[in-house]
């Protein structure tokens, strides 16, 4: 049997009404109708394959294919993050940098890093895990006293993308808030960074419900392994080639390489015309 060409659904219906099939032909025709109906149901109107559901996202990722000193593409756009009050960069087009540090423990570098920030008059944000407040209260107080933001990096550093219950999510943040209050005597700023960048869209919604701004990053490098620290030259090349307008820079407070290069990094960026702002200056 020679099968007719199938066009739009209306044409298919008209064709079927005029079609007088034999037994086998009827079976084939029914199969075609079913397959067409399924395709119409699952394909979006533009004919393109649908993207994976946002709830499936579990790791923050960046694509630097746009080239040197260009804002990388996040696996969730800043426009989409705006819906949840979250950021990975400042897309206003100004020559500004937001410097942030993550830490779960102290490795003897925080004092040197704070000294450089004080000397260069650069504001920063420190996203700390619960253990840091318990073991380094003096350093936490110094961060706050010198004008830096201390943000919430959770209490136990879990994979937050696996936490769907709001009460469990809240517990991870509230326990850190309590530790901050005990150490500083004040309320914790409402900035949150997911451990290891693991998250789901529901996590963004949960953080927003709790009054938090979720802060990802647009520039980082492999600096977290204390047994495999990058060389000074590698670190400077990697960071300088990828710095861009509105960058939110993530460095690890435990990195001896970061402590070594920070002053050179900051002065170099200042020479390029960059200014440094606190996270409170981020605007949607």
Residue ranges and their predicted role:
Residues 243-280:
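Catalytic grooves of carbohydrate-active enzymes
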Residues 94-97, 107-109, 118-250:
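Metal-dependent polysaccharide deacetylase catalytic core of the NodB/CE4 family, i.e.
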Residues 101-103, 253-254:
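Short acidic donor-binding/metal-coordinating loop in glycosyltransferase active sites
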Residues 2-100, 106-114, 119, 265-268, ...:
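N-terminal pre-catalytic segment of deacetylase/amide-hydrolase enzymes
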